[in-house]
Amino acid sequence: HGVDPEDKDGFYRMLKVYAENMAEHRQNVFRVSLELIRSSRAADGSLHLDFSEFDRWADVFWDTGRMDLLETGFVARFGEGGWSSREVLLRDFSVKDEPSGKTVRLDGKEFLPKFLPALVEHLREKKWLDKTVFHICDEPSNHNVMPWREASDFVHQCAPELRRIDAIETTHCLDRLEVWVPKLNHLSTWQNAYEEAQRRGNEMWLYTVGIFQGGSLPNKTVDVPLIDS
């Protein structure tokens, strides 16, 4: 876009263009990365958090007047092999060590119990808590749903106020997820199980895949080759 990487104001002006374009196309949910929250650790081990960039990004979208939800999170990752892995692991987080001035990586089990309650309090102060949904790990499936459940439970223990959301390829999410987001083909295959989850009070979305995948459901993917349509 011709924006100088050092021109932060220019970047946010361009982000506003994107936000307005999303709103014009009836997109009412936006995402803010947790990486925008700057973390530092004092000599006594206490964690200090700077939410200024997180807030500035979010305000660009709220200021459209047409956004309903803020998405953030993604605090876990798949093990070796990516999506096919049977492991779901809490990820590491970058933290500036104040005494040394160096950036260190903290394990999620050490970082999240301090970070998540502070995030909840900040969201509450901004009056955003009820408008926030929080990701654990993208697309857990039957072959790795058990470690995903453990990661989701860990987040819930640290911050029970956060409403959890994930794209899922499984039905085994009861008591570990508030907003379920299956693909259209999984919704079709396991419709009874998903309807039961709704009866138990879970919110149900569905999502459209960004890469072409074949199948009998025409609305499964964003783009479908004409020959297949």
Per-region residue spans from a language model:
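Aromatic-lined carbohydrate-binding surfaces of glycoside hydrolases
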Residues: 1-163, 167-178, 211-213
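Catalytic-core region of carbohydrate-active enzymes that cleave or remodel glycosidic bonds
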Residues: 179-229
